[in-house]
Every structure is written in structure tokens, then in C-alpha cells.
Amino acid sequence: MRLPEQPGEGKPENEKKGDGGALGGGEEPPRSQAPDFPTWEKMPFHHVTAGLLYKGNYLNRSLSAGSDSEQLANISVEELDEIREAFRVLDRDGNGFISKQELGMAMRSLGYMPSEVELAIIMQRLDMDGDGQVDFDEFMTILGPKLVSSEGRDGFLGNTIDSIFWQFDMQRITLEELKHILYHAFRDHLTMKDIENIIINEEESLNETSGNCQTEFEGVHSQKQNRQTCVRKSLICAFAMAFIISVMLIAANQILRSGME
């Protein structure tokens, strides 16, 4: 994940151009590699069901007046569904709240090693009622307007991503083409190395939990289609989560900078 630059920090003098990682095709310079984490530290696989995951009345609830409220009112059901799934991935224990520990584990699984100060700032930004955890309403109130802005929609169109992965499933585009399409869509938030790492991690996670992946396809001949659907949905979820965490890091950096002025 492209990290927001902190005041007084610069790039290492010995930074050299890399070869793009194990999958090849990368154009980003190498960064310090995060240590390997045990399986439980990796992002868990959450299958995206065929039906909508969030059918509540969130859009009908009263929100604070202002432009943020207007932007939230313009969120489509599909966009809300994707944001809800990203929240579910961050909520590792499924209790309906994101804790500071869960947020830290999610960020580490994507290769970013947050300090306690950074985690505290992000949690303070998200935790509006001060109870030490983040529920979905808080998650949406803070991040929703950012995700549905003109810039956000360009990188967070789930239907477009879904179409890209469908083409990959049907072998209409190669892995290299897939990576470069995703890099073009997310280049303001993710590096090529990030994209390669997410694909590798999601493939490994899927292999470890393949028995838990269920889709609407049944029968022996649908095994390949089930596999393709699970990979595609898992990757969509991972990229949505990475995008949201990137937005959170930008917000945290803005708070840090404003506090030093």
C-alpha cells in the first residue's frame, strides 16, 4: 500500500527499481518486505453471497446535516453492499465491531506496519462515540462520503471489478493483463507489488479454506465455476478492503500534519 509520507521522512537512498515481485510485470521500486505471519494473521476468506449482504434501513436513518449526508444518500445498494463486505472482513470475530487489534491485523496482512500512534489516530477518527470500537454506522459515516466521491468511484466500482474478474475467469485476459488493469484502476492507492501480494495471499487463503467456499452453483460439472467465482469474489473483497484502509491512512496523515502546524 502506498504510504502517506510523514513530515521529515524521505525515501531510502539505496532504493532501486525492482522486477515487480514473484508474479512479474511490476514497475514499482521495492520496499521493505513485511515479515511472514502465521496463517491466522492472514486476512480470512469471506465468501460474498449471491444475495445482498446489507438490506437495512441505513439510508433512511437521520444523519447529520451537510454535504456528507447528501453523499451518503447517493450511495447505491451495490456500493453499500461492497462497503458492508469490506467491514465484515475487517471484523474478524464477526461481533459487529472493528477493534483496534483487528484493524492492526488487517493492515499488517497487507504489508503495512502501523505504529501505535497511527492506529490510535485512525481509531479515534472512526470511533465517533468513543467506546473503543467501530460499528458499521460509524464506518459508513466517516468513509462513505470519501468512497462515493468522484475520485473514489473511479477506483471503487465493484461492478467494473466484477466484470474484469469475470473476463479473467473465462480466460479472456491473462494474469499479467489482469494485474495491469487493476494497477491502472488503483494506482493512486496501491502499488503493483501490493496487487501481486493481495492476489497471492487470497489464493493461499482460498486454498486453506476451500471447503468453506459455497456458491449457488451445484453439481460435479460446476466445480471449476465455483472455484472461479470464489477466487473472484475473494479478490474483490480484498481490493475493497485495501482501498478503504488506504483512505483511512490518508485521513490519519492529514490529522498528523494538521496537528504539527
Swiss-Prot record:
<keyword id="KW-0333">Golgi apparatus</keyword>
<comment type="subunit">
    <text>Interacts with PI4KB. This binding competes with FREQ/NCS1 binding in a calcium-dependent manner.</text>
</comment>
<keyword id="KW-0812">Transmembrane</keyword>
<dbReference type="InterPro" id="IPR001751">
    <property type="entry name" value="S100/CaBP7/8-like_CS"/>
</dbReference>
<keyword id="KW-0479">Metal-binding</keyword>
<dbReference type="GO" id="GO:0005886">
    <property type="term" value="C:plasma membrane"/>
</dbReference>
<feature type="binding site">
    <location>
        <position position="131"/>
    </location>
    <ligand>
        <name>Ca(2+) 2</name>
    </ligand>
</feature>
<feature type="binding site">
    <location>
        <position position="129"/>
    </location>
    <ligand>
        <name>Ca(2+) 2</name>
    </ligand>
</feature>
<feature type="compositionally biased region" description="Basic and acidic residues">
    <location>
        <begin position="8"/>
        <end position="19"/>
    </location>
</feature>
<feature type="binding site">
    <location>
        <position position="138"/>
    </location>
    <ligand>
        <name>Ca(2+) 2</name>
    </ligand>
</feature>
<protein>
    <recommendedName>
        <fullName>Calcium-binding protein 8</fullName>
    </recommendedName>
</protein>
<dbReference type="InterPro" id="IPR011992">
    <property type="entry name" value="EF-hand-dom_pair"/>
</dbReference>
<dbReference type="GO" id="GO:0032588">
    <property type="term" value="C:trans-Golgi network membrane"/>
</dbReference>
<feature type="binding site">
    <location>
        <position position="91"/>
    </location>
    <ligand>
        <name>Ca(2+) 1</name>
    </ligand>
</feature>
<dbReference type="InterPro" id="IPR018247">
    <property type="entry name" value="EF_Hand_1_Ca_BS"/>
</dbReference>
<keyword id="KW-1003">Cell membrane</keyword>
<keyword id="KW-0472">Membrane</keyword>
<comment type="function">
    <text>Negatively regulates Golgi-to-plasma membrane trafficking by interacting with PI4KB and inhibiting its activity. May play a role in the physiology of neurons and is potentially important in memory and learning.</text>
</comment>
<feature type="domain" description="EF-hand 2">
    <location>
        <begin position="114"/>
        <end position="149"/>
    </location>
</feature>
<feature type="binding site">
    <location>
        <position position="102"/>
    </location>
    <ligand>
        <name>Ca(2+) 1</name>
    </ligand>
</feature>
<feature type="binding site">
    <location>
        <position position="93"/>
    </location>
    <ligand>
        <name>Ca(2+) 1</name>
    </ligand>
</feature>
<feature type="region of interest" description="Disordered">
    <location>
        <begin position="1"/>
        <end position="39"/>
    </location>
</feature>
<keyword id="KW-1133">Transmembrane helix</keyword>
<keyword id="KW-0677">Repeat</keyword>
<feature type="transmembrane region" description="Helical; Anchor for type IV membrane protein">
    <location>
        <begin position="235"/>
        <end position="255"/>
    </location>
</feature>
<keyword id="KW-0106">Calcium</keyword>
<dbReference type="Pfam" id="PF13499">
    <property type="entry name" value="EF-hand_7"/>
</dbReference>
<keyword id="KW-0963">Cytoplasm</keyword>
<feature type="domain" description="EF-hand 1">
    <location>
        <begin position="78"/>
        <end position="113"/>
    </location>
</feature>
<dbReference type="GO" id="GO:0048471">
    <property type="term" value="C:perinuclear region of cytoplasm"/>
</dbReference>
<feature type="binding site">
    <location>
        <position position="127"/>
    </location>
    <ligand>
        <name>Ca(2+) 2</name>
    </ligand>
</feature>
<dbReference type="InterPro" id="IPR051111">
    <property type="entry name" value="Ca-binding_regulatory"/>
</dbReference>
<feature type="binding site">
    <location>
        <position position="95"/>
    </location>
    <ligand>
        <name>Ca(2+) 1</name>
    </ligand>
</feature>
<feature type="binding site">
    <location>
        <position position="133"/>
    </location>
    <ligand>
        <name>Ca(2+) 2</name>
    </ligand>
</feature>
<feature type="topological domain" description="Extracellular">
    <location>
        <begin position="256"/>
        <end position="261"/>
    </location>
</feature>
<dbReference type="GO" id="GO:0005509">
    <property type="term" value="F:calcium ion binding"/>
</dbReference>
<dbReference type="InterPro" id="IPR002048">
    <property type="entry name" value="EF_hand_dom"/>
</dbReference>
<feature type="topological domain" description="Cytoplasmic">
    <location>
        <begin position="1"/>
        <end position="234"/>
    </location>
</feature>
